[in-house]
Amino acid sequence: LTWTLPNAEHAYGEWMRVLKTGGVLLNFDANYGKDDASDTKDLPEQHAHFKVGNEMLEECERIKAQLPISRKNRPAYDVAVLCENTRGEIHIDQELGKRIYLEKDEFYNPAPMFSICTVKK
């Protein structure tokens, strides 16, 4: 849930700082900042967003607008930040969502999910 952090850049720096040499950082996330939580036209009728109500979806949008990471192009932003904090290789999987969301059910996530993996050198 990196996208919910008020200072993701600092978080990445701290994660890499405390990770021991040879340790693995895995991040599974999506570019939620680009999505409008209240846009439900492509969601199945049993999707969770229909159960939370418009007030909560609007609050989500207000909170998201305050988070700097919401204005970033992800995962490119994440990779750039990690490049500043590690000498290790960084692997990105931008097809993750296609493999884990095989059907549009109540858990379906329309934001394209990605994973990032790096090993601290």
What positions do the PLM features span?
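Short loop segments at secondary-structure junctions
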Residues: T21-G22, K121
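C-terminal alpha-helical "lid/dimerization" subdomain adjacent to the S-adenosyl-L-methionine
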Residues: F28-E103
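A short SAM/SAH-binding and catalytic strip from SAM-dependent methyltransferases
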Residues: L1-A8
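Short, glycine/charged-enriched secondary-structure capping and boundary segments
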Residues: E9-A11, T40-L43, D105-Y108
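A short glycine-rich, Lys/Arg-flanked "PGG" loop and its adjoining helix->strand segment in the class I
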Residues: E9-T21
